[in-house]
Amino acid sequence: MRVALLSDVYFPRVNGVSTSIETFRRELPGFGVQTLLVAPTYGGESAAPDLIRLPARPVPRDPEDRLMGYRAALALEQRLRDEAVDLIHIQTPFVAHYAGLRLARRLKLPVLATYHTLFEEYLHHYLPVAPSGALRGIARRLSRGQCNALDRVIVPSQAMAKRLASYGVTTRREILPTGIPCAQFAGGNGAGFRQRLGISPTRPVALYVGRVAFEKNISFLIEATDRARATLPDVLLLIAGEGPARAALAAQVAARGLGENVRVLDYLDRSTELPDCYAAADLFVFASRTETQGLVLLEALAAGTPVLALAEMGTAEILAPGEGTVTSPDDPIAFASLMADLLTDRAWLAALARAAPTHASRWSDQGLAGRLAHLYSDVLAGHAPRN
């Protein structure tokens, strides 16, 4: 089987969508599925036979992101025909979505999409002058129209499936999270990572990994760290990632006098640096309210690092009492109290750390890729070309 993946985002842009695409592309050939990825160019990427880079333009207010050229995407029609593509799988709801739909109609192919992101909660961060209620309504209507034009919609969590149903999406929804390569995150050199950063082996360290964006609610973690230092004066919050909220968060850190308690790192290489970073932390902390899955929580658990998080949207489906995770109320005071308790109680942390890898193994990359391959076959078997 040959599947064309269309996405407005891919590496070197680091986020959950890029990671999901890479994970499935790596594992699907083991199930008889070859992929051809169509993605924007960011400049300087090396060529690959199974990856087409299209001219792209930056997204306003978020220069890290790109939108592929619509006409350039449609010009791939003959290439996809020559490649004997069987199915089109859209990964983003922007230019890639509309180009993917058009190509599928022209080629009479089935088309499905993964709904990775809860856009109704994101738009107001990027269009702050517009009323947030109106933007949410627009996002819901757009999502409904986009999803109902597909043969199938993949969502990474039950919470996201319910949200799309509330929009009026009638297309069949399949719950299929992205898996993780658990072995890749096990056995990181945490002591070496601490030494490289000049962090004492005994200092209590909490870690956030991910995009430094407003919707990730990192300001909540900074406030919680500020409150936790009343009990643990040397507590350290590491923030590993980049994004449009860095300047605002730096201002918050300065205003609270947290220069010695919060450090912001750049993006870390997923295979060579990130496992060491997870292993260096005593606790992984996460406060996003809009995650459709929360891959970084699983990565931390696979590394044996306990997780403290809010149980919101897809994150709630990962959190399980006693399975390496602790759930906090959506309140920075309560979060800070749990954070301090965990970092102080080494026996509790150790018990959670022992349970964490087993819990993470339920999201194995191979197992979930096999489910996706089966879904592709099911969609192909039931496909009747639309007008």
Predicted regions and their residues:
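Conserved acidic donor-binding segment of nucleotide-sugar-dependent glycosyltransferases
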Residues: A320-I333, D341-R346
